[in-house]
Amino acid sequence: MDNIGVIIKIEGNEAIVMTDDCSFKKVPIKDGMHPGQKILVPNNEVIQKENKSIKRISAVATGIAAVFLMVLSLIWINKPGRPDGIYAYIDVDINPSLNFLIDREGKVKALNPLNDDAQEIIRGVEFEDMFFSEALTQIIKISKAKGIIDENKTNYVLICAALDDNYNLQSDDKSRAQTEFEEFLDGIRESIEKACGNTVIPQTVKVPFEYLKMAKQNDVSMGRYLVYQKLEDIGVNLSIEELKSLDIDEILKKYGVGFDELFKSEYTELPYGTLQTGEDSVVSTEDVPVSPKNAFETMAVPTNTPSISTKPSATPAENPTPKLTQKPTPVPAKTGERTSTTPTPTPAPTVRNGTGSGLRGEYYNNMDFSRFQFVRIDPCIDFDWGEGTPDQSIGKDTYSVRWTGKVEPRYSETYTFYTVTDDGVRLWVDGVLLIDKWKSQSATEHSEQIYLEAGKKYDIKMEYYQHVRAASAKLMWSSKSQQKEIIPSSQLYPSDGPLPQKDVNGLSAEYYGDAELKDKRFTRIDDAINFNWDKDFPVGELKDGKFSVRWVGKIDTRYTEEYTFHTVANGGVRVWINNVLIIDNWQNQGKEAENSGKIELKAGRQYDIKVEYCNYGEPAFIKLLWSSQRQKKEVVPSKNLFAD
């Protein structure tokens, strides 16, 4: 009876194979064989030797303990004996790489460190039965404390997840199972974003169960295996040493690939039709004719991938794609050896297709880039938001976006750059301001030309603001050889650098122990100016019973119209908006005296605000209010105030 086995080691012209019954056999080596490959082992091909050879195999097994452990992991994945109740496997790559096993409720049932850094991170912490999102948040916090995550830059966390094969097969509705799993991953991303702020950007990707098997075979995380496959797709021959030793972001930067490139495709099947799979997927030799040449190379074909693929089932190839191995160097012809040459026509100029991933997009919740909200990598600038919004955290009106990075032309010639935006736009290429239409407008095309050289990367920056109603933004190019098109992600490379600081709501407050704003006692952030201290003054040990306060920061409005600002106070008060003094009554006023001043303001912009108040020993009281045609009179809320 033929067996299924995994190649443990190759020695000379022979391969040592461990079969499903955990026995070791030797078979003749064939082209394409490599360690870790699953093959058919016909009995008539097993090399029969005397007993001492079998003993030698046992000795060899001791010398290849690491490989044997890897094979045991494969057996655990491929056999029905793996842990019960497992819903999904999740690999997390920060710099440490960790493997989580979770149940249907999203609780951690096991956590395995995949490298030494990960072992150090989880030391002394109990994660079992903790919800996965909570466990990951805890790991991120530990990583921050240990300096693994730098809070002064963007840190990507790659979360690669595979639905358990048994769970998927037992589900009555596979489509529903996949949908629920995707919703689970979306929830993880949202939880981490909410808990960790904008310095940590979680990226989740769902892959077939076979990715877990291949990752185990190669002793890497699913995320790293995904990176390997992506780079191989674009022609990068990444070594196993690089894959294991470098951080994922270092690998991607080295080869000019953006993080978002990993998420453009839906991974519903392995990139190649013939990859190692479980015993339950083995194709019968009765159904697949096997010639003597490829008898040892027939491999299992996935028939139960978690996601439904529209592609036809793959047929086993004669020479399956090996796992992570270097491509052989071509052997030159021997000296004097006659070689035939065929004349070839003069090739056309080479088109320099890039390996970019898009531009860095900084999104702001107003029109003048002062209320930073989040950053992401946009594959290209081709947006038609209509009367919607780029993100739930951004209002549908009065927002702005700044895209930065580099652009790589395919040809050396004069390029025309086009913008189509509703509303304002500015475009710089190679430091030159090509388009400057910073005004509210319906969707309008503008263009300008500049000479560029093929293969050279030029700085590019596009700024855009949305005023009200419809919103759209597009960036295109054309040249003599380049037809007009949206600039593709392959020719765009995102910039890097620290994130803009997010605004803190409220106003910066300075408290003084006199009425002249000289004896500063302390500073703090006040949510709003709405105080009734009475005789319980905020400043103690006053020289003459007087104190004063200065509030400074920024203010924005919801509407574009004239606003009236009101102060209700029992001391002196002054108010500046946009450096204009609109209220000036610096004297001791009666109880709850009201003053007001007016100024025209535009929605979506921040204006400087300064308020000064002094108390002359009377019960202390001050409020800052506003009103307009559409704004009811109220205390200016914290959400419209921003501390310096």
Curated annotation (Swiss-Prot):
Organism's domain of life?
Bacteria
Give residue ranges for domain PA14. Answer: 354-491, 502-640
Which subcellular locations apply to this protein?
Answer: Cell membrane
What is this entry's stated membrane topology? Single-pass membrane protein
Which parts of the sequence belong to the RsgI N-terminal anti-sigma domain? 3-50
Q: What is its main location?
A: membrane
Q: Can you list the GO cellular component terms from the UniProt entry?
A: plasma membrane
The record's induction entry says: Up-regulated in pretreated yellow poplar (PYP)-grown cells.
Q: What residue ranges lie in the Cytoplasmic compartment?
A: 1-56
For this UniProt record, give its keywords in alphabetical order, as a comma-separated list.
Answer: Cell membrane, Membrane, Transmembrane, Transmembrane helix
Checking SUPFAM superfamilies in the record gives:
Anthrax protective antigen
Xref: SMART domains: PA14
Segments of skewed composition (Polar residues): 302-328
State the InterPro entries in the record. Anti-sigma_RsgI_N (IPR024449), PA14/GLEYA (IPR037524), PA14_dom (IPR011658), RsgI_M (IPR055431)
User: Entry's Pfam families?
Assistant: PA14 (PF07691), RsgI_M (PF23750), RsgI_N (PF12791)
Indicate the transmembrane segments per the record.
Answer: 57-77
Task performed by this protein:
Anti-sigma factor for SigI3. Negatively regulates SigI3 activity through direct interaction. Binding of the polysaccharide substrate to the extracellular C-terminal sensing domain of RsgI3 may induce a conformational change in its N-terminal cytoplasmic region, leading to the release and activation of SigI3.
Q: Summarize the subunit comment.
A: Interacts (via RsgI N-terminal anti-sigma domain) with SigI3.
Protein name per its UniProtKB record: Anti-sigma-I factor RsgI3
Source organism (scientific name): Acetivibrio thermocellus (strain ATCC 27405 / DSM 1237 / JCM 9322 / NBRC 103400 / NCIMB 10682 / NRRL B-4536 / VPI 7372) (Clostridium thermocellum)
